[in-house]
């Protein structure tokens, strides 16, 4: 858990497998009352989510927030687009970095900080299959080395 983070509600583990994360930043989320109740109950799925910069605003798409059971008529559509709250300079920087460079914005983590839902947004570049295999191979080698070092240190 990074410095200053609150209770982690959801993580997107697949994003770190499919993308190389270049930079991360924290964004607020504009949610309705029933949506925040569902988020606090950890009923959120970030798996297919992505963010886009449109007209000077950042929008989060394909993130599923399950309808709140007791929300009845106030429930929103589960996969509606949601606005992300960032400073103007951050939005301009993201727009420059994602425009025509093969970079994308992926949600990495949702957590509650000081009573507000925050999203850890990653600036990412897609991995090819051979990059994924290389990452897996490197991780297994590190585990083997750690296992050997642990065995040596226990003697």
UniProtKB/Swiss-Prot annotation:
The keyword RNA-binding appears for this protein: yes
Entry's localization field: Cytoplasm
Superkingdom of source: Bacteria
Gene3D superfamilies assigned to the protein according to its UniProt record, in alphabetical order: 2.40.280.10
Key words, A-Z: Cytoplasm, RNA-binding
GO cellular component: cytosol
GO biological process, one term: trans-translation
Signal peptide region: none
Presence of the UniProt keyword RNA-binding in the record: yes
A GO term for molecular function: RNA binding
UniProt similarity note: Belongs to the SmpB family.
Purpose: Required for rescue of stalled ribosomes mediated by trans-translation. Binds to transfer-messenger RNA (tmRNA), required for stable association of tmRNA with ribosomes. tmRNA and SmpB together mimic tRNA shape, replacing the anticodon stem-loop with SmpB. tmRNA is encoded by the ssrA gene; the 2 termini fold to resemble tRNA(Ala) and it encodes a 'tag peptide', a short internal open reading frame. During trans-translation Ala-aminoacylated tmRNA acts like a tRNA, entering the A-site of stalled ribosomes, displacing the stalled mRNA.
Cited HAMAP family: SmpB
Alphabetical list of NCBIfam families matching this protein: PRK05422.1 (NF003843), smpB (TIGR00086)
Full protein name: SsrA-binding protein
Record organism: Streptococcus pneumoniae serotype 2 (strain D39 / NCTC 7466)
């Amino acid at each position: 858990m990074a410095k200053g983070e609150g209770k982690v509600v959801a993580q997107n583990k697949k994003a770190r497998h499919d993308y190389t994360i270049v930079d991360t930043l924290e964004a607020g989320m504009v949610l309705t009352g029933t949506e925040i109740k569902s988020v606090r109950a950890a009923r959120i799925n970030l798996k297919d989510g992505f963010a886009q910069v449109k007209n000077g605003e950042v929008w989060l798409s394909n993130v599923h927030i399950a309808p709140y059971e007791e929300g009845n008529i106030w429930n929103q559509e589960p996969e509606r687009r949601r606005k992300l709250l960032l400073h103007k300079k951050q939005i301009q920087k993201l727009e420059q970095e994602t425009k025509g460079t093969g970079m994308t914005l992926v949600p990495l983590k949702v957590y509650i900080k000081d009573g507000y839902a925050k999203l850890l947004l990653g600036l990412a570049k897609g991995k090819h299959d051979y990059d994924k295999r290389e990452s897996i191979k490197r991780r297994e080698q590190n585990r083997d080395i750690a296992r050997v070092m642990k065995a040596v240190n226990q003697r």
